[in-house]
Amino acid sequence: MSEHNLKGTNANVPASDSPLADALWAALGTVEDPELRRPITELGMVERAQAVSEDDGGYVADVKILLTIEGCPLKTTIEQDVRKAASTVEGITRVQVEVGAMNADQRSALKSQLKPERTNPFTAPGSLTRVFAVVSGKGGVGKSSMTANLAAAFASRGLAVGIIDADVHGFSIPGLLGVQEAPTRLDDLIIPPAVDAPRERGQVRGGSPGGFVKVISIGMFLKGNQPVAWRGPMLHRALEQFILDVHFGALDILLLDLPPGTGDIAISMSQLLPNAELVLVSTPQHAAVDVAERAGTLSLQTHQKVSGVIENMAAMTLPDGTALEMFGSGGGAQLAQRLSSVLNYPVPLLGSVPLDVSLRTGGDEGTPIVWGDPNSPTSAEIQAIAGKLLHRDESLAGKPLRLNV
């Protein structure tokens, strides 16, 4: 019995004894950690990988994987992916996988590799991540639903998307996206859970597979439906930690779901992410428009750009073809016109999303309508809004960059 070993398997480019060993390593390099979205061979997660000859002339792939933490909920997924990848190597007739966990030193080394310093990656020179803060003047206008569905729309185009649920007192993003996993901790570094855009629907309306949404929310750190009673300084520190201590990796888009109004979080966001573009959500109702205008004009003080207005809960088309204007009409266009006048630059109406029961039920079930019913008129409107937000001629925005730095 002979062995074809990979030596120094915690290095990115290990020494090898044979082409079979090289092929096994290359196959393992196609396996990504589901949260970090990086090859396990780059993350020091492969402790052993060897091809051992058997009496029948075949080879068994003997692999040991180190998970980042004990009791990792993604253990089964990673193990299955490793087995599948190793079994594709020509000459391998059997695969055996041992699963362990990193020790403290290995986790510390991984943390240093992922984020050597506690810095803000979204304001760093050369950052190509577009940052959008989704805001509203008042609650109940569907701001969080729009945030979740915009993220789904971006991901369906093959983009890497992150969401910070900054509505600390009224967090809801994990539920709207069906995210139940808790974040992974590497010392003081937080790895957010991710949800993939459905592959079978990734091609809808010109999209591409491979997109995903990473989510962080204060709700992931609480038991049950526990309320949060925090004031300004605590709210600022929470947002700061989400920005500085959460490892999102390379993102094309970062969305923030802000609480309604112009309070502490809105001010903290402008200080921590001055490059964030504001997207206002309002219903057509004129009372909602008046409040939303105040949220938009705050940008004069924070020196941030308002990229547009989304009118949510617009006219619903009934089975007989008539339109039901539950919340009136024209509010979104009126808001865009008012802000254009006050801010002295064009603020477009990005789109009018109709009142749709499926949007609500999809949120309750944790499946955004953009994924659950991608060919519906509502999904088409949200996709069109996402396309308008991505359009910026002078940048690379909207292109999946996938840079691992």
Enumerate the language-model features and the residues they cover:
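Extreme N-terminal, non-catalytic leader segments
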Residues: 42-55, 61, 68, 75-136, ...
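Walker A/P-loop phosphate-binding motif and the immediately C-terminal alpha-helix
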Residues: 130-169, 296
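N-proximal, solvent-exposed amphipathic alpha-helical segments enriched in charged/polar residues
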Residues: 2-47
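C-terminal boundary of histidine-terminating zinc-finger modules
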Residues: 365-378
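Short, hydrophobic beta-strand segments
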Residues: 2-12, 59-69, 132-134, 277-278
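Residue-level signature of catalytic and energy-coupling elements of molecular machines
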Residues: 28, 46, 72, 86, ...
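Conserved catalytic-core segment of NTP-binding enzymes
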Residues: 245-248, 252-352, 357-361
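Phosphate-binding loop that captures ATP/GTP phosphates
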Residues: 154-230, 236-237, 243
